């Protein structure tokens, strides 16, 4: 039944269509095309070869369909009649049209009954082609960027060809064949090559150029994560004790202790107490009363720590076993001549002290700052490249702006340490300069105290806890003499070695009233820190001859304010060989000097009071910042700054805290603004607010009803 119906339906087509079909497939020629441009635009309407199901040699069961159909589009009255050709074989024919392939009608075995759907598809394809031509007219066919002559910010010249297509003039100049890339029409009036050809990768896009310029001129520091990976040298077999195979018949077990991996270990347990005792603690002779109350007074005194140099035998042993270090050197090239040669001599000494597992980076500054070398291991190749780079340094005479360059160079040095991918156990930053940025009186006092032509001062960046050693070489030819050069090398070597690891101090009061207590301890070196009312102070690592200052605050009863107080200090360190905590056996006791009254005025006492007010202000501001009270923290810091003297060092610390607060405040205000932003007044928001108010009113009414009935449960209504 099914096959008979299909045969009857398919053979009902008029047989007159076979003759035109055969005639058109054998003798039909293409109509003349007016212009190549029209063919390129409407060539997509030629239906590609669609395989049709047709009868073979009088077979009665095949379905025959017309092979040639003409498509008439009423929306294009001036267009010529388009013919759709279909070959008799099932192999599709490739269209030579220049239109895009994704706009061509895909070949599908459809019958002639779907002509209406094909007509709708032709209209949609025509619409898509018109949109394509419209978008192509606003783009350059060479660089594929937009061509908008109406934009005011567009500075690229535009060339409009005879075929009404627009291009960038710089892109057209690079063409060898003067033909339109869209329609292949020849140009009679070709543009003159007055402008150099521009790289087509970027073109003349007015949107891209500001982004590239912004990246080039940005002031943000780059990411310095190109450090050389750590590769420790293999341990020599001579330093490892070989384990001999025991005899199977030998039943006697040796009771000898394990000698350790290093046979020639020069550090013994007898040296540990001397290492732990190399910490000098002293109290300054001035003490001041900063606050007086009805029951208690507040006294302050400064405690100073210093890591004294170790004996030569222990120092050599520590150098042999010291951990590897990541060192960033900051070199001052602002003054040429003899000062530059001195900096080069100092840098060569630093390079000679580094071992193969250490890494070195070089940053220089003059009128600007630049990183010359990333963190590189000091192998033989690394030493040669570092020395070659130091020898090629050149100085520049500058008159001003060096201070800002020093700050930028230090920021880059800290960025090198922070962005490194791999880390050595120890990290340091060396600043080698002639000390011109230091006050002359301070530099002379330090030189007279040490009697050597260079001064070393150590500070710390407390955010990443990086020690910064500033080496000021006052005399230009100081390192030309052998004794001074040896002293400088020994001093630099002591800075590379951490003398005391993880130092802790335990403070307590021996005599006096039980109401006397140590209320707070403030660190004055580096970033200010408050250790609170606890008696344990975390000092950290100390280099050789490094000094730390702490401000100790005492709460003393008013009745015993005139009596002397005794403070005991007990220190503990971590041994760098065994990594075990060790306590110094000797407890040090100090007599706290009698404080001066509030009315007493002197420069040292005034400095103590300013330091105390500054430390209290910084501690209070940080406490308020933790509570997100930025306005209160700003008010506390500004009040302390107005009360501080301009010649005091505490003013600099207050300025640092204010700058940090100013960076936090805009970010927090933006967050609060986004969180507390009121909802825009719309009918929906008004309806939502009315619903909330209605719910609140219903809840209140319900609560009022419950309160009215309260106590009437047993009223026997």
UniProtKB/Swiss-Prot annotation:
InterPro entries the record matches: CLCR, VWF_A, vWFA_dom_sf, Znf_RING, Znf_RING/FYVE/PHD
Q: In which tissues is it expressed?
A: Expressed in root tips, cotyledons, leaf primordia and hypocotyls.
Q: Where is this region: Disordered?
A: 13-120
> What are the entry keywords?
Metal-binding, Transferase, Ubl conjugation pathway, Zinc, Zinc-finger
Q: Where is the composition biased (Low complexity)?
A: 95-117
| ZnF segments: RING-type | 140-184
Q: What is its EC number?
A: 2.3.2.27
Which residues are in the VWFA domain? 326-456
What name has this protein been given in UniProt?
Probable E3 ubiquitin-protein ligase WAVH2
Which source organism does the UniProt entry give? Answer: Arabidopsis thaliana (Mouse-ear cress)
